[in-house]
Amino acid sequence: MRFVSFQKFIPIVVFVMFSGCIDDGLKFNSEDEVVKKEEWGAFTVVAPVDTGINPYHEHFKKNESLPMWFLDEFGVTMTCELTQTGTWEERVEADRETCWNLITYNDTVYFSGTWIIGAMGEEGWSETPILDDPDDGHGTAVTGAVIDANPDAVIFFLEGFDGVRRAAEHPMVDIITTSFGPIGSIPVSGIEDDTEYAVNEMGKLHTGACDNTGSTCVQDATGGPPWSIGIAGFQEDGDRGKVMHCSGTAPDIVADWTQNLPDHDSIEGYHDTSGTSFATPRTAGVLSLIIQELREQYGDESSGGRNGSLIYSENASITNYDIRRSMEKASYFPDATEYDPGANEGACQTGVPVSPVAPYTQTGWGVVDPTISMMIIEDLNGSSPLTDKDFDCETYMDSIMAARIAYWS
């Protein structure tokens, strides 16, 4: 897409939600640390900002912990050695005195046995800092969607909506993903100042959820600002085939509406859940996988925006805008024949096929899922450049972007 000055266009990664003890076990001598860093290779850091997370779930378990050099560089102040036996409730209670009750706002906490680092985005958000609330679970599912798209993403989880700024300021974060906002995308201020800082000043990407109603996304503080990637919902694999569900109108792209995601109050449980809240972090995961692969190809073993680029080495300089534009070109329009007019399904009961005439009026640039990852990688490394979309699509999306720029300027 042809943008005006890209002052307001460096993407971030965010979430959209509805409207310890110091580790003495992770020790390396200096020689081990050097070897570990050399072996670690490329990585990405995704920052979901949401209700909380369940680090006990098997979905987040890793065979190796994050290395000490990484924790030091990230600014980790505390490591929680999580209990590995018992029910979810028993594990939480067993760890209260050594972990949960010790966490303060000033802490950056690593949960051993995972690649999850957490912090409080705002004080007093919940009774147990960072841990997902017993009556919620949104943040755990959101993070699960990131990991489904990129199992090797490092997670920096921020509990509470004010955590966007903390994620934006952290130099090692690549993508912020947010899945919260008022129902109906009513035009009120929200996190736009913090996401703009993350994208335009820090060079990150931000993915923001459009509303779950049919309201336009333009005025939505989470997904509407021009520097944010606004994401609506699309049923990728349902009983009725590929279906557009009711969710924010005029998004940047659409992604999978219904997913099977981890429970917030169990060790192994999963549930089907729907909404742009989960389409959004899935997109963040896809983008993080692309960034990680490009860093691997170019020998970039750092993270965050550096010198204006998310991939930065002697042979490469790829910005958040470059990645966003490539995503726009690689996204695809489903064929109307893939729709099966059966019984309505899912949380939204007005699912319809994607129009064969002007699909971009429903999907924006199109669907983003893991199948297009290699196309984006090969476009950005120059091995197989992508072309622009058809003139009608480019013109329509330019008009939507102009409206967003006008509204948020």
Where are these regions (language model features)?
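Active-site-proximal beta-strand/loop segments in catalytic clefts of secreted hydrolases
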Residues: 48-52, 145, 149-150, 157-162, ...
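Subtilisin-like peptidase catalytic core
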Residues: 51, 115-190, 235, 301, ...
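Secretory targeting signatures
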Residues: 1-27
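C-terminal subdomain of the subtilisin-like protease fold in secreted/lumenal serine endopeptidases
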Residues: 173-177, 292-409
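Active-site core segment of subtilase-fold serine proteases
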Residues: 28-32, 36-140, 144, 153, ...
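Extracellular S/T/G-rich loop segment that most often corresponds to the catalytic His/Ser-adjacent loop
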Residues: 105, 220-296
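Gly/Ser-rich catalytic serine loop of serine hydrolases
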Residues: 131-140, 213, 271-284
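Loop/turn elements at helix/coil->beta-strand transitions in domains of secreted/extracellular proteins
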Residues: 42-46, 150-155, 171-176, 200-206, ...
